[in-house]
């Protein structure tokens, strides 16, 4: 806690407060030409999109400038990372400037699909002298501009504040999701006893989630020609859940993209029955959505594990620095061992996330109103990962302050 009151941390925290204020202010500015009183249901199927937007700094409840949030940008980063893992594509050989341009173009494509699909299904007001096409174009442009403004705000927070994009997402989650959970409790008329049990099990799960989040498997590392009493403290750490809670957050967003795309197609073919059924099946509560959601979490958890712990880079770095694992040759043998170990924990972590996010969501098949309560474990996983990420950043920034001068 003392680290928080260091001048550097306080300065960064004040900058973050300013950026959060700008974000909150922008999220209150409603899109022009939109009938706010008629957007509550967003064509009757907004639950999935609402949660996906909230998990990425967006807000579909008030249809503001930041309604789609950082979803296009964060989705493009994920897609790009998954492609750069493969050496065959050679994307990691491109210059940083070229990679950034391609990521931004991918962000633009995703933002265009989401913005256009959203605007075309909004209840728009008719204004004298302004055509429907002009209104759609302007609102789509504003939503895309809002996304790029948030990207810029995130970059500023990364360099001047704390948490980077995490702070925007955390504020979005805190602003809307607890309120939704409380409304569900009131709507379902849950008794105080059941509510107390939910609170107790939530605390137990919170404790378990923190343990899993910080749990690590340590591989002893030796260095050539270095023998000292500190040798036993040299390890390669692999987290048990290397992906953290990110797969749950990204899964909700990626699963919502097909729904945006179908909404876009439905505007041009309003009587297409297949499109309407597709939108309904991809809404929360449907079996296709549930299967796709869990499958996406599993795949992302597996992918994130290999992205976060790249066996090729680790083996190459160890070989250059003269490090080796006991009874293993440096190079290919070391790479295979690390890859196999990461694969094992990737499977364990993916299975853990699927159980944590999937089992509580089975409640929605009893009553869709349980959906918000079923999301609580997943929200805990996401939030815990964000909190520890900020804590690690603060610890890194104050690392030098832990050492004192001898004179």
Curated annotation (Swiss-Prot):
Coiled coil: none annotated. GO terms for cellular component: plasma membrane. Its main location: membrane. The keyword Lipid biosynthesis does not apply. Keywords: Cell membrane, Membrane, Protein transport, Translocation, Transmembrane, Transmembrane helix, Transport. Gene3D superfamilies: SecY subunit domain. GO terms for biological process: intracellular protein transmembrane transport; protein targeting. Disruption phenotype: Loss of adherence to human platelet cells, loss of export of cell wall protein GspB; GspB accumulates in the cytoplasm. May form heterotrimers with SecE and SecG subunits (Potential). Component of the accessory SecA2/SecY2 protein translocase complex required to export cell wall protein GspB. NCBIfam families: acc_sec_Y2, PRK12417.1. This is Accessory Sec system protein translocase subunit SecY2.
